């Protein structure tokens, strides 16, 4: 088997746990039923602005980057931090920071941009299933 990776060298990808579908609800009752939410605004891109005093932490961790081919994602948000109060959440994909595209950026470059900026304008979108696909996190 020349040219092929040994089985143990393949990356491990964990899928989210299976969720049983909710009980069937007639279509005319779905509008008001709590198990049927057609509100998609939580998945639309949004802007988050953070100001970081010198020496302070941002209040969140990131994962991913160009090597993972998945983009940069928020892997953890510290409760009661400025990032938490600004609306960042675990599973947010970072689309850009201060007009720098983060969708195809090296992890180290993303960390450098986030750590050196004093005022950060982030464009993010919520993508919850990214949490199960990402490499170990890095505190920023």
Curated annotation (Swiss-Prot):
Superkingdom classification of source: Eukaryota
Record protein name field: PDZ domain-containing protein 11
InterPro entries given in the database record: MAM_complex_regulator, PDZ, PDZ_sf
Keyword Cell wall biogenesis/degradation: no
Keywords assigned: Cytoplasm
Annotated GO CC locations: basolateral plasma membrane; cell-cell junction; cytosol; presynapse
Major subcellular site: cytoplasm
Lineage: Eukaryota, Metazoa, Chordata, Craniata, Vertebrata
Gene expressing this chain: PDZD11
Compartments reported by the entry: Cytoplasm
């Amino acid at each position: 088997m020349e040219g092929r990776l040994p089985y143990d060298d393949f990356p491990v990808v964990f899928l989210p746990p299976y969720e049983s579908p909710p009980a069937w609800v007639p279509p005319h009752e779905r509008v008001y039923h709590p198990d049927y939410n057609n509100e998609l605004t939580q998945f639309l891109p949004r802007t988050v602005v953070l100001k970081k005093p010198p020496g302070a932490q941002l209040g969140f961790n990131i994962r991913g980057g160009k090597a993972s081919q998945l983009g940069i994602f928020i892997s953890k948000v510290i409760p009661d931090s400025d990032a938490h109060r600004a609306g960042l959440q675990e599973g947010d994909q970072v689309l850009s920071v201060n007009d720098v595209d983060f969708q195809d950026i090296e992890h180290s470059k993303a960390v450098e941009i986030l750590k050196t900026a004093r005022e950060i304008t982030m464009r993010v979108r919520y993508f919850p299933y990214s949490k199960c696909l990402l490499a170990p996190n890095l505190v920023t």
